[in-house]
Amino acid sequence: MPKIKTVRAAAKRFKKTASGGFKRKHAYLRHILTKKSTKRKRQLRPKGLVSQNDIASVVACLPYA
């Protein structure tokens, strides 16, 4: 049986947590930041968790995570 390839784009974006979830970076924090409030930018700063609905897709991309 051949090895399953990891989707490298996903490997760079998601990190597995100890409880089996996946950490991710919030969107909307790369450019066009002047019109966004300081509060909004601050709330986007910490890592988020992947939704339960999307976990299966991430696991399929990261077979060895």
Curated annotation (Swiss-Prot):
Gene Ontology MF, one: structural constituent of ribosome
SUPFAM superfamilies named in the record: L35p-like (SSF143034)
Any Pfam family: Ribosomal_L35p
UniProt keywords, alphabetically: Ribonucleoprotein, Ribosomal protein
UniProt GO cellular component terms: cytosolic large ribosomal subunit
Gene3D superfamilies in the record: 4.10.410.60
InterPro entries per the UniProt record, alphabetical: Ribosomal_bL35, Ribosomal_bL35-like, Ribosomal_bL35_CS, Ribosomal_bL35_sf
Biological processes, Gene Ontology terms: translation
Keyword Transmembrane in annotation: no
Family: Belongs to the bacterial ribosomal protein bL35 family.
HAMAP family: Ribosomal_bL35
Protein's name in the database: Large ribosomal subunit protein bL35
Species in which this protein is naturally found: Hamiltonella defensa subsp. Acyrthosiphon pisum (strain 5AT)
